């Protein structure tokens, strides 16, 4: 049943909402027909969805390709590069937010979900992109930010006015404690308190991220109805799926209990009604309209992920876990994610293996090392200078050999690196907030230690402009780029890599081709080898009589494999990043990767 949203105010009295108000009795005939297509059906078959055969490419539009000289990437720039993505061989294009936004958090603070920000173009440009991508058999996945909006959103502006209007409960408001302090000790992921006092309403509002990103109140059915209607709107425009930003944060404990430690974020995930809300969304929108989903789930572990992605649960198709991205983090440190240690490859193997085994036949993995929130993997965990090609292709081999849907972040396919700027050259609000919190206020980190961590893990490492060629500004813009270009662009760029003998792009092309032609990658079983080895990542994939050994030396050391394991007979070499590799008896060189049939 469609969630009713009978409203106590007229739509015409609320400016710039761009939302059709829902009512079960007056829903359009077109929508009714769509909802009836799959009514009552449950998707049980784990082998018939387009995204299970797909490789998906993420574009960060602001940094991808500028066609106007504004210094910001735009939608026309994405259309211009569709032949490049077609050449790479990807099946889906995930766009980070392009909605109307003040850009406090680079578009993850949305003012209007139905309007494209003029920074990127127009709604008509977006519709052209959808059509042009579909003409090349590339699906479009939009970013879905439903935990919070911008504080400039009309919903929030109306909500601030008082406690007795329709939008009053669209956000999470609480009275101050008797001493005027915050309702509890919850912290923001961007540093400081998760509560901000609003002088106009004379209450605190909740924000898990920036103060300019107030959290929506999913307990309010009208909020959910508005969100679902936005999803219908974009489906009608041709959007094929959603990447769901921090979707596991949408439910909050309504008792608002204190955390064990002040200003921490342990409360932010898996609230009491999370599964209920996501299931409702699935039944209202996702299943009836056949929309693919991948949800951001920071706290998910392999053993409980099935609750979100099992077809029988009718919630999401895939989730992005953060678990494997914490192998270089000091657990429990007061400095949170900025407290780093050397990468733990044994832990990485254990985590990825658990996800492979736990979700087999119960769900589907989303595979990634990089995205707009993650630093370049070769700079973070590998060698981005002497062995840049080998390192980039070795990590790619390990990831693309697993069962699941691989996600490639822009520039990953040419081996882009972290820039190592000076502290004042970074722009990310998370970085600035955490610097203030840990270095200035708590003084638990020195500026030098914080900058060293920034060079490894800051979100800005992934957000430098795409490096297309060796012309000024890496061919990204004819104007002044919104964010500094990595100075190494004359050496690392698309044009140069396409011509290189050792081309990261061409290696990715081959990995993608294998994904489309070799069923063993989709359906084969998984078995980890050498689980305690600190340099070698090796596993078997098996499908019927066919067995592949996926193997990578993720170190700069020369390693004799025969000293670690019995060497199988090799029937054929499937792919390798050292072209002279003919068998397994030879020494494995720095960041050497190979897939062989045995």
Report each predicted region and the residues it spans.
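Acidic/aromatic-lined carbohydrate-recognition and catalytic surfaces
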Residues: 44-232, 236, 249-301, 308-311, ...
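Short hydrophobic targeting helices and cationic amphipathic motifs
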Residues: 3, 17-19, 33, 38
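C-terminal beta-strand-rich structural cap/linker in extracellular carbohydrate-active enzymes
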Residues: 583-598
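Hydrophobic residues within beta-strands of alpha/beta enzymes
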Residues: 93, 242-244
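Loop/helix patches that line or flank the sugar-binding groove of alpha-linked glycan CAZymes
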Residues: 50-51, 266, 276-288, 292, ...
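Beta-strand-rich binding/interaction modules
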Residues: 558-578
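Short hydrophobic alpha-helical segments enriched in small aliphatic residues
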Residues: 5, 9-12, 19, 24-27
